[in-house]
């Protein structure tokens, strides 16, 4: 992990990297009021294993090595844990199955704050 990055810096840089690799359905959830496990979850969707790995690699290239990485082998759901920020890169079927949007639905959606775009509606899965 690159030194001196705040949680917001990690979200911004990781989000930029994911979008540069054409990640879709990107959401940023602020979890600070709900849990101590992380301040932010960043969810994104890839259309293939190859794209999922490319997104995860781009995030790691921007932020440096994660504290923990899970799921690179099959790339259905790749998790990159940066302590206060956790990036989730899903293939579409895995995203539908695990439905983290529902699980963390009480969290503030801050996608627009970080991307400069209006928050995308969470698709009903």
Residue ranges of model-derived segments:
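P-loop NTPase catalytic core of nucleic-acid-dependent motor ATPases
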Residues: 36
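Short amphipathic alpha-helices in soluble, non-transmembrane regions
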Residues: 55-61
């Amino acid at each position: 992990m690159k030194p001196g990055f705040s949680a917001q810096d990690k979200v911004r840089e990781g989000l930029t990297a994911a979008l540069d690799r054409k990640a879709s359905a990107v959401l940023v959830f602020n979890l600070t009021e709900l849990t101590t496990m992380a301040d932010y979850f960043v969810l994104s969707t890839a259309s293939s294993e190859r794209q999922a790995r490319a997104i995860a690699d781009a995030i790691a290239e921007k932020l440096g090595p994660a504290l923990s990485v899970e799921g690179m082998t099959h790339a259905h759901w790749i998790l990159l844990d940066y302590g206060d920020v956790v990036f989730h890169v899903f293939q579409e079927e895995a995203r539908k199955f695990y439905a983290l949007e529902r699980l963390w639905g009480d969290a503030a959606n801050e996608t627009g704050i970080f991307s400069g775009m209006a928050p995308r509606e969470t698709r009903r899965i």
